[in-house]
């Protein structure tokens, strides 16, 4: 179970030396993702919050640097809670929330499982669909996990709080459910591959911290491996793995979810000198941060892929943001940028929902 929960970067590198390079890619900056946490700063150069995560920093003798939350020390867990309000949700709560989304779409309860206290009983019958809806429609639903951490709402290889390993037939993630639907409705490898690719292209998540983001991408990649091996009793070819990794490098991206830019990428602007006597070196605060205007940030705005056109687009375009059929995430997630929020902060889920 140790290897299953904590995916070793050295193992991925040995599997295919291109995979980690793809999984580390940040398409918004056209560089690698950044650490965006000071938890690794004690290691020195290459591990500071604004440093890009290099392959050599997490492989070879550094192959054990990145660990899932459940494998981190309590001290480190508490520090991340304090610094970035990092919250991980047990699988049974993720299941309740995912069930709620499915109840809305299927127009009935207990579609994939029945909740029983802090666990669930799997519905083993083939899933049926409401009139006018098909299994293909379900697979294509665009689902976003906000502030996704290790992506427990999307895939549930293990409980991110307890570390308990979940067998395939007991998984509750949104992508797990889509792959189950594909399994129930196709009978050959080509169709299975094509529809699972559609499922991945419709599954999204963003995260601030680089280590958690990489783990999320790894979890989604190995979810593909888990289901492929179970279905075809063989390991997927490298081309399949690289295809999935490339999708994940776009769909699971690094972002400040309140500003829609790469974390901490906003920089002060040079002040315009109005007179000879003014200090022309005094910088001005990022206008977007100062005015709480998301169209005026000096940071690097994040890009996502429009898979219908195979062209990248900015996630935030003026007052328009990419929309999704369902948005899921930790219940406390709120917008803390509006006024005095000591007692109340408005939720942000609706900002991403399809209208």
Label the predicted regions.
Residues 2-355:
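SAM-dependent methyltransferase catalytic region
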């Amino acid at each position: 179970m140790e290897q299953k929960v904590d995916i070793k970067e050295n193992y991925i590198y040995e599997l295919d030396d291109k995979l980690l390079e793809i999984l580390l890619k940040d398409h918004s900056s056209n560089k690698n993702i950044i650490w965006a946490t000071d938890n690794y700063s004690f290691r020195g150069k290459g591990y500071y919050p604004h440093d890009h995560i290099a392959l050599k920093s997490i492989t070879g003798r550094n192959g054990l640097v990145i660990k899932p939350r459940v494998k981190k020390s309590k001290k480190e867990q508490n520090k991340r809670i304090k610094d970035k309000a990092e919250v991980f949700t047990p699988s049974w709560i993720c299941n309740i929330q995912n069930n709620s989304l499915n109840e809305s779409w299927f127009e009935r309860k207990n579609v994939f499982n029945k909740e029983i206290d802090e666990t669930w009983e799997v519905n083993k019958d083939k899933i049926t669909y409401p009139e006018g809806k098909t299994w293909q429609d379900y697979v294509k639903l665009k689902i976003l996990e906000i502030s996704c951490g290790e992506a427990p709402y999307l895939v549930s290889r293990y409980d991110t709080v307890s570390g308990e390993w979940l067998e395939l037939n007991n998984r509750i993630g949104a992508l797990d459910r889509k792959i189950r639907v594909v399994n129930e409705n196709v009978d050959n490898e080509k169709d299975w591959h094509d529809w699972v690719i559609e499922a991945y292209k419709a599954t999204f998540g963003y995260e601030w911290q680089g280590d958690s983001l990489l783990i999320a991408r790894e979890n989604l990649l190995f979810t593909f491996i888990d289901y492929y091996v179970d279905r075809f009793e063989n390991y997927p070819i490298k081309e399949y793995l690289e295809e999935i990794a490339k999708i994940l490098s776009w769909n699971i991206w690094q972002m400040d979810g309140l500003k829609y830019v790469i974390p901490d990428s906003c920089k002060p602007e040079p002040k315009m000198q109005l007179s000879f006597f003014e200090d022309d070196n005094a910088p001005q605060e990022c206008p977007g941060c100062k005015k709480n205007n998301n169209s005026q940030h000096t940071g690097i705005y994040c890009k996502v892929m429009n898979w219908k056109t195979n062209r990248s687009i900015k996630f935030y375009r003026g007052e328009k943001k990419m929309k999704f059929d369902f948005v899921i995430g930790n219940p406390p997630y709120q917008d803390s940028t509006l006024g005095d929020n000591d007692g109340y902060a408005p939720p942000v889920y609706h900002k991403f929902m399809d209208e």
